[in-house]
Amino acid sequence: MAAKGAREKIRLVSSAETGHFYTTDKNKRNMPEKMEIKKFDPVVRKHVIYKEAKIK
């Protein structure tokens, strides 16, 4: 039986407090720290920082 993969599903939540989020996955071995990335928030129609959160 194969081992579990290192990739984990995460949720990127908008820092503009609009409730908008993106879902993606990341490799925990290569990037153990929390992910922060600048993406477009369609609610405020601007690029804002999205921070990693766990998928519930």
From Swiss-Prot:
Molecular function via GO: structural constituent of ribosome
Name this protein carries in UniProt: Large ribosomal subunit protein bL33
Residues of the signal peptide: none
Species for this entry: Mannheimia succiniciproducens (strain KCTC 0769BP / MBEL55E)
Similarity remark: Belongs to the bacterial ribosomal protein bL33 family.
Alphabetical UniProt keywords: Ribonucleoprotein, Ribosomal protein
InterPro entries per record: Ribosomal_bL33, Ribosomal_bL33_CS, Ribosomal_bL33_sf, Ribosomal_zn-bd
Pfam families in the record: Ribosomal_L33
Zinc-finger listed as a keyword: no
Alphabetical list of Gene3D superfamilies matching this protein: Ribosomal protein L33
Biological processes per GO annotation: translation
Cellular component GO terms held in the UniProt record: cytosolic large ribosomal subunit
